[in-house]
C-alpha cells in the first residue's frame, strides 16, 4: 500500500468516526443543574488540525482527555452570568 493510499484510508476513517481533540482548558460548568462542562479543545487530526474550539461536554472530563468530535465547525457560546 502506497503512502497516498494510506493517507486516504486514514482520512476516511477520521471522517467516519470523528475528529480527535485534546482538552487543554476547563472553563466552567453550565446547564440547569451544572451537568455540562465547557472546555477548550485542540483538534489533533483532520482539516482543522491545530484549531482551538470551545465545546460543551457532558460527563466527567479532565485536562489532557481526548474527545472525539463529530464535526469541528460549531463552537459553544460564551457563558454569561445572569444579573
Swiss-Prot record:
Keywords: Ribonucleoprotein, Ribosomal protein. The keyword Acetylation does not apply. One of its GO terms (molecular function) is structural constituent of ribosome. The keyword Ribosomal protein applies. It comes from the Archaea. One of its GO terms (biological process) is ribosomal small subunit assembly. InterPro entries: NA-bd_OB-fold (IPR012340), Ribosomal_eS28 (IPR000289), Ribosomal_eS28_CS (IPR028626). GO terms for cellular component: cytosolic small ribosomal subunit. Belongs to the eukaryotic ribosomal protein eS28 family. NCBIfam families: PRK04007.1. HAMAP family: Ribosomal_eS28 (MF_00292). PANTHER family: 40S RIBOSOMAL PROTEIN S28, SMALL RIBOSOMAL SUBUNIT PROTEIN ES28. This is Small ribosomal subunit protein eS28. The lineage of its organism: Archaea, Thermoproteota, Thermoprotei, Sulfolobales, Sulfolobaceae.
